Amino acid sequence: MEIKLIILSLALLLDRFVGDPPQLWQKVPHPVVLFGKAISWGEKRWNNRNLSASVLRRNGMWLTIGLVMACVVLGLVLELSLPFAGTAGAVAEILIVTVLLAQKSLADHVQAVALALREEGIEGGRRAVSMIVGRNPEHLDEGGVSRAAIESLAENASDGIVAPAFWFLVGGLPGLFAYKLINTADSMIGHLNDRYRDFGRFAAKLDDVANYIPARLTGLLASLATAITKDRLSGKEAFSVMRRDARLHRSPNAGWPESAFAGGLGLALAGPRQYGAEKVEGPMLNASGKRDANADDIDAALHLFWSTMSLMTGLVIAASLIGLLVG
C-alpha cells in the first residue's frame, strides 16, 4: 500500500503543477478519449431503439461489463509488467495515474468562466461554461453561469480527482482504469432520455455505486478545508448543509460535494436546470444562501477547491511517510 501512496502523492503533485499538456493530446489520444470511442462504438452497434426495453438494458449491461473487464485486464498487465522496467516502470505508472487525474485541467476550465464573465460579459461566460456542463447555457444569467461553474467544480472534484485516487488506492491500475471507464460511460450514456434511458441504465447505476464513497469523502474534505482556511464556524456550516441537503439532489452522489461547497461558500446551488430540450426540476441546496453568484464567487470556489485538494494530497503524503517509517 505504501508504494501506491507514494505513486499517488507524486501523481497528485504533478497533476496539480503541470496538468495535461495540450500539445501531447494533439498528437496522441487521451486514454479517456479511447474509452469514449469504445463506448460510442458499442452504443451505435447495440442501442437499437427498435429493440425492447429489456433487450436494450441487457445490451447496455454487457457492453459496460465487457469494457470494464477489458480495462481491468489492461491494468493488470501493466501493473504486473511495469516493475520489471525498474525506475522507468515506476515513472510510467506515476505518469499514467497523473493523466487520469484532473485537478489543473478542471480548475483551468472553471477559471476560464470567471475570466470570460469579467472580460466578455454574459455571452462569453455562457460559451466558457458550455465547455464544462451538459446543461443548456443559452438562457442563463450571470448568477446561473456562475452557479453552473461552481456546481461542476464541486461535482468533478469528486468524479475527476477524489474518486480516481480512491480507486487507485483500492485496486491499483485495474481499479483506476475500471473507474474511469465507468465514469465515462455514465457521462455518455447514463442519461434519462429516450435514447439512453434503458441502454445506459446499468452504466448509470454502476457509476452511482463507484462514486458512493468518494462523493462523501469529497464533501467531508471540503468541509474540513473550509474550517481550516476560513474558520471553524464556516466549516460546521458546510458540514451541516451537506448532511441536511445532500439527499435533496437528483443524483445520489453529486449532492454531497455540491452541498458542502454551497454551505462553505454561503451560496444556494443546484435547483432547476435545462439539458437541451429537457428541463429537470430540483430543489436548491442551501436554499437560504446567496443566489446571484458572480465571478468573485467562482474565485472563492476555486480557493476552496484547491484547499480541498491540498488537504487530500497532504493526507496521502502523510500516510505514505508513515508507511515508510513503519515499514
From Swiss-Prot:
Pathway: Cofactor biosynthesis; adenosylcobalamin biosynthesis
Keyword Cell membrane in annotation: yes
Subcellular location: Cell membrane
Transmembrane segments: 60-80, 82-102, 159-179, 304-324
Membrane topology: Multi-pass membrane protein
InterPro entries for the chain: Cobalamin_biosynth_CobD/CbiB
Primary localization: membrane
Single GO MF annotation: threonine-phosphate decarboxylase activity
GO terms for biological process, alphabetical: cobalamin biosynthetic process
Keywords: Cell membrane, Cobalamin biosynthesis, Membrane, Transmembrane, Transmembrane helix
Any Pfam family the entry gives: CobD_Cbib
An example Gene Ontology CC term for this record: plasma membrane
Matching NCBIfam families: cobal_cbiB (TIGR00380)
UniProt-listed HAMAP family: CobD_CbiB
Entry similarity comment: Belongs to the CobD/CbiB family.
Function: Converts cobyric acid to cobinamide by the addition of aminopropanol on the F carboxylic group.
Name by which UniProt lists this protein: Cobalamin biosynthesis protein CobD
Gene this chain is encoded by: cobD
